[in-house]
Amino acid sequence: MAAAAAAATVEAVGVAGGRRRRSGSVALGDLLRREASAERASASASAGAGGRERERRPSVAAGQACRAKKGEDFALLKPACERLPAGGAPFSAFALFDGHNGSGAAVYAKENILSNVMCCVPADLSGDEWLAALPRALVAGFVKTDKDFQTRAHSSGTTVTFVIIDGYVVTVASVGDSRCVLEAEGTIYHLSADHRFDASEEEVGRVTECGGEVGRLNVVGGAEIGPLRCWPGGLCLSRSIGDQDVGEFIIPVPYVKQIKLSSAGGRIIISSDGVWDALTVDTAFSCARGLPPEAAADQIVKEAIASKGLRDDTTCIVIDIIPPEKISPTVQPAKKAGKGLFKNIFYKKATSDSPCHADKDQCTQPDLVEEVFEDGCPSLSRRLDSEYPVRNMFKLFICAICQVELESGQGISIHEGLSKSGKLRPWDGPFLCHSCQEKKEAMEGKRHSRDSSSRNSGSSE
């Protein structure tokens, strides 16, 4: 009956228009069949495109090696993680944790940091939206991990270097001095920051302004020895997870860099300071060139121990991002390392033995590794102040760090001047719960929770 009525309606329209077009009459059943057929064709095309996209994605192979001295280094290798809810392309996650003053913080971070980061990513994002949300989620996940661990009243701490690989996009978040380095098409790129006080005058200034004291260890006679350290506690790092006995100004806010590799792929090395205190970056890559990841990591650790002995836990993770057309990874000979922070893109750098040195005309179009995102600012307010995708507005009324749901009047805006606002308005967010706001204030030096102690005391690292 409904189909007949629909056909009659189509025919009547033809008559009203002054022309009788029985050939234009279409039954509702035919319309539905055509629409279903079109949807099937569209779904098939999408599936084919998705399959082709998966075929174009690189494979990821990884291996690790460790020689223990104190038993405080830990590694996380998850080459195939699934985004939830299911449907998105899989990603890989790798992390290195170099603990100090005990292994508690390193073990806790290894067990919790991935889930803490992922719970800060809104659900149902497209691939590009998911990648764009990662830098903020990494900041929130690191701070949540630190905040939750400190409720356990442990005095240990840990560095964290956390790597997420999605296709050719690599996102790295780091606190501490466990460096992450990439070699792509013969060029070396530094993807992490060094948070030792000796490496950053800005971090020395930040900690001092927040109430900490930075100096070297005093010995008998008034001489100062060793690296710069923060007192109380004697920690030589300005950022870490844990370290409750040192001070809240030792913050867990990570340096984050996101890059996109060319289709040539590349090799990544993540190592604790047991490796980097013994080997240069060039040596680490060259001594393991041509080896698969597991053997490469083992070789790098062996070289480090042969150079300086086993003075500390020595851990290495090697990750190969392999283009689909390559059966096995091929790592190009290394050129001079690019160092420091890069803006927008990385350019290949030639050394004296590079073909570019002999013929500059052949190097006018260098291959690029695109920098998508970079931020190492210690301000939690700035690092969390980025918008969610519009279709995930409901997340605005959840604490940006611990992800608890906020009721009316409970949330505190991260923006200055709005922290005492009673009624939540979407444009005032993101928001923090009261306990996360206290954590933020302590990290900024607005609330001191530790007593000072002498620089003559023992050191944490």
Swiss-Prot record:
EC assignment: 3.1.3.16
Binding sites annotated in the UniProt record for Mn(2+) 2: D98, D273, D312
InterPro entries: PP2C, PPM-type-like_dom_sf, PPM-type_phosphatase-like_dom
Induction record: Induced by cold stress, salt stress, osmotic stress, hydrogen peroxide, abscisic acid and jasmonate.
Tissues with expression: Expressed in leaves, leaf sheaths, panicles, nodes and internodes. Expressed at low levels in roots and stems.
SUPFAM superfamilies the record matches: PP2C-like
Segments for region (Disordered): 34-63, 439-461
Superkingdom of source: Eukaryota
GO biological process: regulation of intracellular signal transduction
Record flagged with keyword Transport: no
Family matches, as CDD domains: PP2Cc
Cofactors demanded by this protein: Mg(2+); Mn(2+)
GO cellular component, one term: cytoplasm
Any one GO MF annotation of this record: metal ion binding
Binding residue positions for Mn(2+) 1: D98, G99
Cofactor note (record): Binds 2 magnesium or manganese ions per subunit.
A Pfam cross-reference name: PP2C
Disruption phenotype: No visible phenotype under normal growth conditions, but mutant plants show enhanced tolerance to osmotic and salt stresses.
Record field: catalytic activity: O-phospho-L-seryl-[protein] + H2O = L-seryl-[protein] + phosphate; O-phospho-L-threonyl-[protein] + H2O = L-threonyl-[protein] + phosphate
Function: Mediates the negative regulation of osmotic and salt stress tolerance through regulation of the jasmonate and abscisic acid signaling pathways and modulation of the raffinose family oligosaccharide metabolism pathway.
Protein family: Belongs to the PP2C family.
Protein's UniProt name: Probable protein phosphatase 2C 40
Organism: Oryza sativa subsp. japonica (Rice)
